[in-house]
Amino acid sequence: NLPIFGDGKQVRDWLYVEDHCDAILRVFEAGIVNETYMIGASNQKDNISVVETICDILEELEPPVRTNSYRELITFVADRPGHDIRYAVNANKIRTKLGWEPKTGFENGLKQTVKWYLSNAKWWNKIFKHSYKFERLGNKNSNWLD
């Protein structure tokens, strides 16, 4: 299953990791001490759209075997407490003052990310097998602080 909390309409601003790293380097190189620079790509997408796009990319790269479509695996579950409806920033300052712009579009960055996960399953499966159990961390019933 691919659990979607609530209706999946929570919005996030998506930024490819290499673009994020480039932005941080740009701040180190040209930023003014004690100034704040918000980093964002203005790629605001709701969670359900992102999951559906991942499903579509997977169908192209690794067609499903046990189902007709990866989208059939999407399951809506109860929303988590305090689930913010939107995370996005105004990144105009880093663009205008430091000349930084993201280079990787949303779809291309997501496809590169999915390809990486498909090519490196042996590496990341070890992490999930031995530590993270896909449980919700930080809820009132967890004992992660014990």
Language-model segments: residues:
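C-terminal substrate-binding subdomain of Rossmann-fold SDR/epimerase-dehydratase oxidoreductases
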Residues: 1-146
